[in-house]
Swiss-Prot record:
Keywords: 2Fe-2S, Amino-acid biosynthesis, Branched-chain amino acid biosynthesis, Iron, Iron-sulfur, Lyase, Magnesium, Metal-binding. Pathway: Amino-acid biosynthesis; L-isoleucine biosynthesis; L-isoleucine from 2-oxobutanoate: step 3/4; Amino-acid biosynthesis; L-valine biosynthesis; L-valine from pyruvate: step 3/4. The active site is at residue 468. NCBIfam families: ilvD, PRK00911.1. InterPro entries: Dihydro-acid_dehy_C (IPR042096), DihydroxyA_deHydtase (IPR004404), DiOHA_6PGluconate_deHydtase_CS (IPR020558), ILV_EDD_C (IPR056740), ILV_EDD_N (IPR000581), IlvD/EDD_N (IPR037237). This is Dihydroxy-acid dehydratase. The gene is ilvD. Pfam families: ILV_EDD_C, ILVD_EDD_N. Its EC number is 4.2.1.9.
Length: 552
């Protein structure tokens, strides 16, 4: 056992004395020591229930003969941090979480890990940490929130952000805004649509690092507790059979995850995180593969924010295994990949059927023959940009308009709320990339305001920052290279004509070669926005969004 390094033989008597200070008996010390990595806290609705998940995992480990020891890690609520300086600290926690797992697991020689995240960056951060440590590991999330109810309709966090735009536009009064606020987020759990948290929790199933059901069983269902117990039992089986994260997450399972991403219409952040996970798994991933996979993978699901269908509906329709089974009818997935069950994906999905073909479309009658995510390239984004095609209105798939340029999210939000944006405009928000932000903030407040004001059918937004999974509309992010690295987005001026052609994967600014060269000669990036602390260090080390915004 790996834990023998801290407990076996006379030379480890001092270490055993410290383990006994924890209250452990000799018998407990002799068993495999399993680290339970929990990001439970009282500021994230999706993490407030993780203490219950931890206790269930603990019971599963004990039932299977292990000794569980819980350790903490951090987590940021993107929804609460949104629209202010605090959002710069969201993406950057992904690396801190991976680093902390590496430090704690290796320092204490854990034999195996059970990872308990739920929201946004915490999920990929834990997967990245597990790949570094590479001991048997299972991800078990806290589960999705139920959708809210208002006047007979399902609502979510997207509803709230867009309601602010409607209020500012004068189409909603304060009473209705407050009424919505009371019921939009009715339970604990990750926000109820196919936003970033649920995207990553679902894709963990497809990667094989989580048990079937991980992505869709609601947080408040007792089935979630039973799944957590099974996760504790599963990690003990993995330890017995020596199944490790790098056995599970490899090129084939990464391709499966990207294909599922297309079929589900996941958050654009999933591209960033899968790229980073691939890096930890030593898999070389080029963004160009995404358009290739998208052309071969139909969009089977249209979930919030692209519709009013939520994760609880996907759960009732059969969940991720049912969606995978539908894709398998056209041999789209590699079903020989091993998973945390000890079985292959093919064995996991055998016999699972779709229960609602309105939520998970038949493979022969998809919402779209192309997947939900697209990579755009052109002189404005030579290294790529990302758009959630599934959430773009048909009339905005091709668009040309004058640029209106901002050097921060705050400047853009002020202009939007002061009604300085006209139909046809292309909002450009720059110096919000991984290095320039720093931290690559999400522009949800801006995109939600555009939608709430009824401009999502005529206004596009491009940025070197990111978007929340709750964003909808012609919102193009991750523009690379970013402005702070001398990217073309830093050269755009008000009035330049921006050409967007999502159907043909193009993003261009209509300038002559000579004009572009003239601007490059006089270009000078703005002063760094943050000059001390963790963000300043992060800005010096972070790579481009096209590389997953990993630290180098």
């Amino acid at each position: 056992m790996k834990s023998d390094a801290i407990k076996k033989g006379p030379g480890k008597a001092a270490q055993r004395s410290l383990l006994k200070a924890l209250g452990l008996t000799n018998e407990e010390i002799s068993r495999p020591i399993i680290g339970i990595v929990s990001s439970q806290n009282e500021i994230i609705p999706g993490h407030m229930n993780l203490d219950k998940i931890t206790e269930a995992v603990r019971k599963g480990i004990l039932m299977s003969g292990g000794t569980p020891l819980a350790i903490p890690t951090i987590g940021v609520c993107d929804g609460i941090a949104m629209g202010q300086e605090g959002m710069k600290y969201s993406l950057v926690t992904r690396e801190l979480i991976a680093d902390s797992i590496e430090c704690m697991a290796k320092a204490h020689a854990f034999d195996a890990l059970v990872l308990i995240p739920n929201c946004d960056k915490i999920v990929p951060g834990m997967v990245m940490g597990a790949l570094r440590v590479n001991v048997p590991s299972v991800v078990i999330s806290g589960g999705p929130m139920l959708a809210g109810k208002y006047k007979g309709k399902d609502i979510s966090l997207t509803t709230m952000f867009e309601a602010v735009g409607s209020y500012e536009n004068g189409t909603m009064d304060e009473k209705e805004l407050c009424d919505l606020e009371e019921c939009a987020c009715p339970t604990c759990g990750s926000c109820s649509g196919m936003f970033t948290a649920n995207s990553m929790n679902c894709l963990c199933e497809v990667l094989g690092i989580a048990l079937p059901g991980n992505g869709t069983i609601p947080a408040v269902f007792s089935e979630r507790i039973r799944l957590a117990k099974r996760a504790g039992m599963a990690v003990m089986d993995m330890l017995k059979n020596d199944i490790k994260p790098r056995d599970i997450i490899n090129e084939k399972s990464i391709m499966n995850a990207l294909k599922a991403d297309m079929a589900l219409g996941c958050s654009t952040n999933s591209v960033l995180h899968i790229t980073a996970i691939a890096n930890e798994a030593k898999v070389n991933m080029n963004l160009d593969i995404i358009n290739d996979l998208s052309s071969k993978t139909p969009d089977l699901c249209k979930l919030a924010p692209a519709s009013n269908v939520h994760i609880e509906n996907l759960y009732a329709a059969g969940g991720i295994t049912a969606m995978m089974n539908e894709l398998s009818k056209k041999d789209i997935l590699d079903l020989d990949c091993i998973t945390v069950t000890g079985k292959t994906q093919g064995e996991n999905i055998k016999g699972v059927t779709v229960k609602d073909y309105e939520v998970i479309r038949p493979i022969d009658n998809p919402y779209s023959k192309n997947g939900g995510i697209a990579i755009l390239r052109g002189n404005l984004a030579p290294d790529g940009a990302v758009v959630k095609r599934a959430a773009v209105l048909p009339e905005m798939l091709v668009h040309e308009g004058p640029a209106i340029v901002f050097n921060s999210e705050e400047e853009a939000n002020e202009a939007i709320f002061n009604k300085k944006i006209n139909p046809g405009d292309v909002i450009v928000i720059r110096y919000e990339g991984p290095k320039g932000g720093p931290g690559m903030r999400e522009m949800l407040q801006a995109t939600a305001a555009i939608a709430g004001m009824g401009l999502d059918d005529s206004v596009a937004l491009i940025t070197d920052g990111r978007f929340s999974g709750a964003t909808r509309g012609a919102s193009i992010g991750h523009v690379s290279p970013e402005a702070a690295s001398g990217g073309m987005i830093g050269l755009i001026e008000d009035g330049d004509i921006i050409s967007i052609d999502i159907n043909n994967a193009k993003l261009e600014v209509k300038l002559s070669y000579e004009e572009i060269q003239r601007r490059k000669l006089k270009f000078k990036p703005i002063e760094p926005k943050v000059k001390e602390g963790y963000l300043a260090r992060y800005a010096k080390l972070v790579s481009s969004a096209s590389e997953g915004a990993i630290l180098k």
